[in-house]
């Protein structure tokens, strides 16, 4: 039995084919994930298999019928099998790679979760914004059902009724409108599934993700060190792991401030974090008549008191060169 069962109800089953690819395909192959796709028109009646009707009270567009969606969600809650998606291609290389699936242990529900009811997710622009915290919570689920709306959406009574059999969540992936819910399903399914233990071969991969600590992830680099005249930051090849981690933290903080400054307001920042945000590299040359080592020592203390971190001071004759990082220039 898979660790997570996804059922998707849609009028465009072929839209869900990407769930068979890459890591999700491997998760299906290894039995970590199973996906069933249900064609909503299987529950429609009449010659035209219509699933929509004009909105009550008038207005543009069409609304999806409750008498079609209701029975569909009833049957899926009872375990009706859909068209099962298998992996897009068998993975015959026995050598584990960074993105291969590993053995998976069951994960318990969080306190307060009612595991007797599956989770029903309804992608809609009117829903609560989907976050990384949602993805983390839902990765512990055993059964998630997606209801893909189209047109002007699904009759609201469908969700009121579905609460008898599901834990219903209306969710939005952004402040924009799509043609239907299928794209949102792909986004949410991938964000959730990749957090299931074993789906990512490197167990630390998702721990460093953007939003995992409330911040955006900083830039990444790989070989070669110099490409088209552009050099990767020297600290990344220094071999000093502490400096590398400090650099990554600083880049994460600065990118978040530039792109999503509101996230910083929601994140606990340490004294070091605040220094990283405000600091800049400083190089200052000072002429001192009769400079001595005592002067250098006094200057070093003064610089540290002024907020410099690890200042380097060189004395050449009567000239002092100060290099370091500080929130305030010398």
What are the roles of these predicted feature ranges?
Residues 2-4, 224-305:
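SAM-dependent methyltransferases
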Residues 183, 195-235:
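Internal, active-site/partner-interface "lid" segment
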Residues 51-72:
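Short, structured active-site "lid" loops
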Residues 2-42:
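Glycine-rich, flexible N-terminal cofactor/catalytic loop recognition
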Residues 154, 158-209:
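Structured adenosyl-cofactor binding patch, chiefly the S-adenosyl-L-methionine
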Residues 37-58:
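Short, surface-exposed acidic-centric catalytic microdomains
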Residues 65-84, 95-101, 108-150, 197:
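S-adenosyl-L-methionine/SAH cofactor-binding core of RNA-modifying enzymes
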Residues 320-322:
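Short linear proline/tyrosine/threonine-rich motifs used for host-factor recruitment
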């Amino acid at each position: 039995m898979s660790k997570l069962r996804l059922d998707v109800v849609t009028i465009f089953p072929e839209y869900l084919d990407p769930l068979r690819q890459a890591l999700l395909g491997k998760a299906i192959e290894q039995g970590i994930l199973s996906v069933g796709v249900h064609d909503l028109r299987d529950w429609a009646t009449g010659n035209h298999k219509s699933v929509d009707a004009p909105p009550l009270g008038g207005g543009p567009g069409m609304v999806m019928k409750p008498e079609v969606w209701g029975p569909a969600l009833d049957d899926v809650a009872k375990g009706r099998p859909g068209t099962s998606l298998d992996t897009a291609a068998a993975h015959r290389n026995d050598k584990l790679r960074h993105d291969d699936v590993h053995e998976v242990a069951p994960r318990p529900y969080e306190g307060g979760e009612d595991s007797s009811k599956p989770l029903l997710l309804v992608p809609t622009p009117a829903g609560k914004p989907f976050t990384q915290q949602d993805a983390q919570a839902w990765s512990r689920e055993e059964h998630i059902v997606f209801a893909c709306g189209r047109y002007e959406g699904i009759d609201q009574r469908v969700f009121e009724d579905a609460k008898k059999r599901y834990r219903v969540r209306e969710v939005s992936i952004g402040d924009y409108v799509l043609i239907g819910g299928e794209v949102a399903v792909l986004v949410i399914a991938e964000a959730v599934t990749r957090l299931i233990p074993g789906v990512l071969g490197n167990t630390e991969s998702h721990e460093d993700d953007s939003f995992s600590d409330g911040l955006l992830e900083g830039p990444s680099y790989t070989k070669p060190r110099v490409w088209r005249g552009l050099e990767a930051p020297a600290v990344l090849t220094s071999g000093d792991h502490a400096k590398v981690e400090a650099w990554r933290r600083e880049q994460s903080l600065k990118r978040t401030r530039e792109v999503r400054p509101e996230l910083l307001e929601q994140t606990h920042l340490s004294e070091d974090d605040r220094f990283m945000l405000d600091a800049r590299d400083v190089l200052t040359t000072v002429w001192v008549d009769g400079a001595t080592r005592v002067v250098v020592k006094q200057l070093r203390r003064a610089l540290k008191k002024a907020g410099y971190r690890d200042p380097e001071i060189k004395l050449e004759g009567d000239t002092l060169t100060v290099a370091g990082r500080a929130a305030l220039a010398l």
